[in-house]
Every structure is written in structure tokens, then in C-alpha cells.
Amino acid sequence: MKLFVLLSILVWLAQPVLNRPLSIFYTKQILPRTYTPPMRELEYWCTYGKHCDFCWDCKNGICKNKVLDDMPLIVQNDYISKCSITRFIDRCMYFIEPKIPYIHYMNCSLPHIFSLI
């Protein structure tokens, strides 16, 4: 019974859930700088980096958020920025490339949303 409870907790912790830190299993792994986060982590990266282009699916100038269903459709514009991400131990970073480049640093287990404003 104890083993079942322990396994249940580990499975629950491994599930990326909106507004919850990245799974402890992923924070221990190095993620080299990339423009396309792993699919299992997309929800995490898009929760705290809503402006990033990898979070949006754009067709004919209309964009839909890939992860956040409550986000309205938007017209493709400067709101969406080209982003890359990286992770080293528990340090998560967004490299945002709007007109003025910006780097957003955060502790992976204590994330916070970045704002371009």
C-alpha cells in the first residue's frame, strides 16, 4: 500500500500542471538553448512566457495559443516575440528577441511571468 501511495505521488509530481513549477524530474536535467521546448514542458514554458512564438499557432495572420485554451485568438503582431529557452539545474531562462533583446531569469521551481512592458 505504501508503495502505491509513493508511486501515485511521484506520478502526480511528474505531471506538468498550469501554474505549478516544472516537475522536479525535469529541473535536474540540463536543457540546451532551444527555440522549441520539449512537448512535455510546453505548458510550463508557455504559462510564464505567454509572448513566446513557440506558444502560438498562426495561420493566415490569426494566432491561437497552443496551451492556454482561455487565451483569445489574436491577430499576428508584435505581441508575439521570438523566444528561445534554456535550463541549467534549477535556473530557467527565456531569451526574448523583440526589437530590444531581453533575458528573463527565474528559479525553475519558483517561476514568475515576464512582461515586455
From Swiss-Prot:
It comes from African swine fever virus (isolate Portugal/Lis 57/1957). It comes from the Viruses. It holds the Pfam family v110. This is Protein MGF 110-13L. Residues 1-16 form the signal peptide. Belongs to the asfivirus MGF 110 family. InterPro entries: ASFV_fam_110 (IPR004848). Keywords: Early protein, Signal.
